[in-house]
């Protein structure tokens, strides 16, 4: 795979070896480096992957015709109801049911939701394709 990415060749190598089940110690021996260095390479690769995902989510959110602000004190049920209502107004079919929406929102905004109640504000967008984008940078 020779496509351009935000990963260095070394990061790609380490991730490929980890995916094959290799321990950091075994990778370090193979690459003639320390386990600590392998750990640092893997950690930086995961940070780059997360930044790439966040960038893609940001770009998708720019194209989201539906955006709702989830405010402190809102319940997950209220958020889902508003999200579905606003999507319906725009003629957009959300590709998930309410249970899956609750799971996805809680997963993406886990540190902002406690016991199904929003503790700090964030936004959710819905793309024309019905995909949900949770924007924690709002």
Swiss-Prot record:
Reported function: Transcriptional activator of the fmdECB operon.
Protein name per UniProt: DNA-binding protein Tfx
Family membership: Belongs to the Tfx family.
Superkingdom: Archaea
One Pfam family this sequence matches: TFX_C
Gene name of the record: tfx
GO MF: DNA binding; DNA-binding transcription factor activity
Keywords of the record: Activator, DNA-binding, Transcription, Transcription regulation
Coiled coil start-end: none
Taxonomic lineage of the native organism: Archaea, Methanobacteriati, Methanobacteriota, Methanomada group, Methanobacteria
An example Gene Ontology biological process: DNA-templated transcription initiation
InterPro entries named among the record's database cross-references: RNA_pol_sigma70_r4, Tfx_C, Tfx_DNA-bd_arc, Tfx_DNA-bd_euryarc, Tfx_DNA-bd_sf_arc
HAMAP family xrefs: HTH_type_Tfx
